Amino acid sequence: MGQSVVVLGAQWGDEGKGKIVDLLTEEIGAVVRFQGGHNAGHTLVINGKKTVLHLIPSGILRDDALCLIGNGVVISPAALIKEIGELESAGVEVRSRLKISPAAPLIMPYHIALDQAREKAAGGKAIGTTGRGIGPAYEDKVARRGIRIADLHYPAQLEELLRTALDYHNFVLTKYLGVEAVDFQKTFDEALAFGEYVQPMKSDVAGILHDLRKQGKRVLFEGAQGALLDIDHGTYPYVTSSNTTVGGALAGTGVGADAIDYVLGIAKAYATRVGGGPFPTELDDEVGQGIRDRGAEYGASTGRPRRCGWMDIVALKRAVAINGISGLCITKLDVLDGMEKLKVCIAYEYRGKRTEYAPLDAQGWEECTPVYLEFPGWTENTHGITEWDKLPVAARAYLRALEELAGCPISIVSTGPDRDHTMVLQDPFA
């Protein structure tokens, strides 16, 4: 049987998953996206060339890797066409290697209109979504009024589904949110055209994955966002609309629990968050700005500045437990170069008591004050180092402390954005 590895974020997203997925896709059978949409922004740097992927799995830059989009992903037709076009214009063969589940829901124009109108109406209480229709598309999926890839090939059924959806959503858009209605004919024509475009890529993703496992091929499941943004286990309501944790890899592709052999959790050597929501270790000072500048902490999808803070072990341990993480990958170690001292949150002060467990609600998180452990920094340059023994003593001590505090071994350390700026201490596929 083949080996399957799930790669997922162990913080609030933007941990560097795309680079690690690309690194691990050498000699791979397939890479599969299992949740989220084009709100994800996976940045790859290979030989100094930067590529940002939003929907297509990060294995697309490997010539022999099959790339799959599972039923758990919500697909924007316009975003997918644009991304395929950009890659193919750069000489990357996409359509012959990309397979998409017919059960994947579509992000329709009314989902985008709803998302943006709601955020505007919420004002200061906005969640901080990307405004790309992800949440409303998942809402329709659960409400059983979603339009899926499979529906595009039955025009009469598609027309009925679309009219029903627009009757509902246009009422909300015009009567409640006070914005313009979405036009039926334009939306219908665009959907039919996309159906023709995507037809050659439509495939039974679950069946492909089962066959690959029987053939002994390696499969990598690529998560988007991070565990602490999970719709069920994150800082609700400041979360994304899908299951970003390991359970999402199963439900979002159609494989069983026995198909997962290793879970790799990606975490930065510090912490970041985009948008609203609790962030106990956030640094609203020159230290936080320094990390933001050195780490280029601006969203790949939105360009928004990310909130920056110290490593939060309480939150990381929660991600390790929820996902059954087998090993950690610590990224952006080099961003901490030159800092005199580092802090790691090892517990919270919560309502007068010390706790090593995170509250289960956003309000509780907001009331938490971090308890820090200090570590000496290092002045040496770690950028691009690929051997453990060549890291500064203080950097090695910091990593070993993270490993011990999180109760999980570190498998990979990243010291720069390029694929080659990486040291693999334990191969997840070994």
Curated annotation (Swiss-Prot):
Protein location: Cytoplasm
Binding site for substrate: 300-306
Pathway: Purine metabolism; AMP biosynthesis via de novo pathway; AMP from IMP: step 1/2
Keyword annotations: Cytoplasm, GTP-binding, Ligase, Magnesium, Metal-binding, Nucleotide-binding, Purine biosynthesis
Subunit annotation: Homodimer.
Its biological purpose: Plays an important role in the de novo pathway of purine nucleotide biosynthesis. Catalyzes the first committed step in the biosynthesis of AMP from IMP.
Descriptive protein name: Adenylosuccinate synthetase
Lineage: Bacteria, Pseudomonadati, Pseudomonadota, Gammaproteobacteria, Lysobacterales
